[in-house]
Each structure stands twice: as structure tokens, then as C-alpha cells.
Amino acid sequence: MRYTGLMGILLTLVNLLQLAATLRIAAFNIRTFGDTKMSNATLSSYIVKILSRYDIAVVQEVRDTHLVAVGKLLDELNRDIPDNYRYIISEPLGRKSYKEQYLFVYRPSQVSVLDSYHYDDGCEPCGNDTFSREPAIVKFFSPYTEVREFAIVPLHSAPTEAVSEIDALYDVYLDVRQKWGLEDIMFMGDFNAGCSYVTSSQWSSIRLRTSPIFQWLIPDSADTTATSTHCAYDRIVVAGALLQAAVVPSSAVPFDFQAEYRLTNQMAEAISDHYPVEVTLRKT
């Protein structure tokens, strides 16, 4: 009995050491994330539980202009450990009255924000902008990983414009390189990069896919949806030799929170119709 208990403690310590030796990053489209969802104790508890898995999490489909829901989220994330998480959020983005924000939550004990900017994709009133929700780009410094500085570029594409928007991320890549002199860049989020929105014949027209600069970590065969569909909408794409080398092999996966927490279909879809997509970076 003592031996069994000791082995359990040792296994727990090994797991903790493994977690401490890595940096876990995710993108999560939380459907219509706002005060209504964060005011529901059950839903908010699962959202906090999911996001607590990550050192950096990019939350998409945030609809919280006055940051009421974001405030509640940070209160819960920091309930047990003060200043465990901080955040940076974009302005409301969208061509018409419907707007969304990109929210980054991160552990300041693991990474720090060096800089951020909104990609200039053209004139919205003129109708010649590229993205429905242009990327809000954040540069991080990570003192403990093999790659010290890297940028995260989020995208929640408009489904009917997924092909052109994913292709245009190549231009965002060039812009980030020119602005910051940085090659280690991670693109992530709900690209709507699958099923009827991006068909097999359309991949050849997407520079982010055809260029050897980029590694696509979530395969076309993946299912990133919490619904009855089987689509690889959510993706992670990495550029830069240091960042690519820092990726732990086979760590880029959708996180099936329904299976992990044994949720009903109804409860899972109430949280979101998407799973987070996650990846782990090695620490030195």
C-alpha cells in the first residue's frame, strides 16, 4: 500500500516536471463569448478549466466591448494565484455592425508581451479591405523556451472568404517580418479551413499552404468541431526555423473537452462549437 502511494506521488511529480518543461499555446473559438456565457456558472467554470491548461491562449469570437466578460474571466483565472494570467485584447473588428475581438490570455511567469499591432488590410469603408477581421498580432518573449521571441497571428476568417483570407496570411507574414525583423511566427485560429469552405482543389491557390516556409501542424483529417460535423476548421501554422524546431512532435492536436470532461453533446456545444487547437513548445 505504501509502495503504491509512493509510486502515485512520483508519477504526479514526473507529470508536473514535464508540464514545467514545456510551453503550451492554444487558439479557441468560444462561440459568442460575452457576459451571458461568463454569467453562467457551469459554462464559465468549464471555460476557465480549459483555458487554465495553457500558458498562452488566443480566444476568438469575443463580443465584449466593455470587457465585462473579460474581467470576470481574468478574476476566475487568477482566483487561486494572483496575477497568474494577464491579457491583451484587440479593438472590435468587423466590416459592419457585427464585431468580434481577439483576446490573448497569458501567464506572465512564462512569457511577456514585447509589442503588438493591428495589420492594416486596406480601407473598410471603401470596400477594399482583405479580412473580415484583420489579425491583431502580438510578439512574445519567452525566456525559458528554445525560441526566445515569436509572434502569434490570429485569424477568424469569414467562412465564404476562407480561401482568400488564408492566402492573405502570407502577406501578413511578410509584413511582420518587415516590421519586427522576425521569422518565427505562429498563425492560429478558426480559419474555416475545411469541408465546403476550403476544398481539396483550392489548396493550390493558397500561398500559406504551398510555400515551403510554413508547417501546417493540424492536418486536414482532424476534427476541430464539437458538433456532428467532421471538419478541420481550426489550424496552427508555424514559420521560422527556431519556432519549428521548438515544437514538440505530435503535440499539435485539437483538445476534445467533451471527451476529457465527459460532457453531453448539449453541454459541449453550449461551451462552444469548436475545440481548442493546441501545441507545445520545448523549454531549454
UniProtKB/Swiss-Prot annotation:
GO-annotated cellular components: cytoplasm; extracellular region; nuclear envelope; nucleus; zymogen granule
Active site (catalytic residues): 100, 156
Glycosylation sites: 40, 128
Disulfide bonds: 123-126, 195-231
Site note Nitration by tetranitromethane destroys a Ca(2+) binding site and inactivates enzyme, residues: 87
Catalytic reactions on record: Endonucleolytic cleavage to 5'-phosphodinucleotide and 5'-phosphooligonucleotide end-products
Cofactor binding annotation: Divalent metal cations. Prefers Ca(2+) or Mg(2+).
Subcellular location field: Secreted; Zymogen granule; Nucleus envelope
Stated name of the protein: Deoxyribonuclease-1
Source organism of the structure: Rattus norvegicus (Rat)
Name of encoding gene: Dnase1
